Amino acid sequence: QPQPNWCYISSGTWSLMGVELAQPLVSDQALAYNFTNEGGVGSYRFLKNIMGLWLVQECRRAWRLQGRDFSYAQLSGLAEEAAPFSALVDPDDETFLAPGDMVAGIRAYCRRTEQHIPDSEGVVVRVALESLALKYRWVLERLEEILGRRLSVIHIVGGGIQNELLCQFTA
């Protein structure tokens, strides 16, 4: 039976990225990269949990607490206008797990890793979105390595599909 050439991303506050398989996949590689198996009806989802739009949601909350209220569309627009790849963060770094001032967290991560420190809302959001898209790329490459085959299609579902900029970066 031919194996599908696609994977999925369930995109929202958190992201799940993986493939559907007939049997669970258990290997040293899967363990090393922190993949898991979830049983479903007639299949198993072999996947990895990834930070999602939590980064942007928490930045938005921090700005709102400072009296600057942005819609997600406004934040995406500002990010689209910002210069690309001014800095990158690992979205799964423990710095970003707890609620709080995510703007300060992103800036602190950039300072700690000796990168450009984002200096505007647009740059902060662009750093978050580009970093998330590159994390998706990293997970895709690990999936292909573990499966031993190329995955040429990504199906994205969930509330995160409303963020067209993230979807474009992911493509």
Q: What is the role of each PLM region?
A:
Residues Q1-I154, Q162-A171:
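Active-site core segments that coordinate phosphate-bearing ligands/cofactors
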